Amino acid sequence: MTISAWRQRLQAGGVSSRELVDEHLQRLEQSEPSLNAFVEVTAERARADADRVDQARAAGEDLGPLAGLPLAIKDNLCTRGVRTTCSSRMLEQFVPPYESTVTDRLWGAGAVLVGKTNLDEFAMGGSTETSAFGATKNPWNIEHVPGGSSGGSAAAVASGSCLASLGSDTGGSIRQPASFCGVVGLKPTYGRVSRWGLVAFASSLDQVGPFAGCVADAAELLQVIAGHDQRDSTCLTADVPNYSAGLAASIKGLRVGVIRECFEAEGLDAEVKASVQASAAQLEALGAELVDVSCPRFNDGIATYYVIAPSEASANLARYDGVKYGFRAEEAESLASMTARSRAEGFGAEVQRRILIGTYALSAGYVDAYYRKAQQVRTLIRRDFDAAFQQVDVLLTPTAPSPAFKAGAHADDPLAMYLADLLTIPVNLAGLPAISVPCGFSAAGLPIGMQLIGNVLDEARLLQVAHQYEQAADVFAQRPEASLVP
């Protein structure tokens, strides 16, 4: 059922918020031993919040659009009084004294927190295997990864542990796990949603967005979290439209650009290619016009990203030194030794690798050759998108080059892991909105996702196209059996 359908049932008295929350907590308790999707479960808080919503409803009070609905939050978003660990030993005991803007808006709309979800440490990874608290598994097949870095949020929605969740997307960390777990994942335009209270990885790339079971639910969450925030200087002041209003509108005559380079990318799985091409044909059957477009520098995105993102991470993570908060090494001989040991023991291998890459790229003698050159290529990638949007309304690609890979498959090959974000990274570099929608299954029964990319602040059109495709394709009518997916 959609958020809208649950809201109507709650308003009609067909179910109480407490019953709805208890149902999802029961699913969470059943699936969590197999999935490890959560860092912390807030069952007591969830039940108390649900009871308060029921009491307010009985008293005839006005309630928010998400009143009594169980949601989960990626554990790199600050939640006052609830641990925010970034799945790192460095922040294992950190309890924020303040609430992030997006979670504050969710609680203001009446949403109920069921827990904080697992992620790759400090959101650096594509499989949710680098978490200090153990890897998350894919609900469709626990031998496979859920994607990353927001794998816990994607797995939580797919397993029915919550109605929807929030994640963050720096290079594909919402869309790729959405594809792997068979849910909808939306990365808004950079600046559409406040980053205040999001633990920073790469500040010019990070963006918060929703995971949901359907496009309409993603639109509902975006409606609540979008909008200007004075505490985030990068947050846009543009008005927030009604994202649900145009979902039912026809897409007849809309121009959908099929990016040539994405379907010619090295390593693109044949089943993924066929499934996404079939989805493009479905859009054409709905009246959209398919247009072949070229973004010549699209596949340069990954090399560009792995200079810019680690450089920003190197600067952002310099604050973790064991002095004011975070992990502190014991019995150090000096301040310098304490700082060095705290960082060596508090950060995992992947985080340390990216800090080293970024520090090198920013070092004297190399900053021009690497960091500034990468920023120039980033500008060229953005111009390619600008040129494409002169011809079309939305762009279409696969979300990921393959379905979910097996756990441990890329453990000794960081480059192979990085390539899982080949098709999502350019969108972050350009600051554009994009959504991953389930579009089929592999022969092994693993979900496949289609990525739709919109122009700046054109989330409404993106959601419209995604919703129309979702309704027509009815992908889950032929879904395979999976014991952990309701």
Swiss-Prot record:
One of its GO terms (molecular function) is glutaminyl-tRNA synthase (glutamine-hydrolyzing) activity. PROSITE patterns: AMIDASES (PS00571). It catalyses: L-glutamyl-tRNA(Gln) + L-glutamine + ATP + H2O = L-glutaminyl-tRNA(Gln) + L-glutamate + ADP + phosphate + H(+). It holds the Pfam family Amidase. Keywords: ATP-binding, Ligase, Nucleotide-binding, Protein biosynthesis. Belongs to the amidase family. GatA subfamily. HAMAP family: GatA. This is Glutamyl-tRNA(Gln) amidotransferase subunit A. It comes from Parasynechococcus marenigrum (strain WH8102).
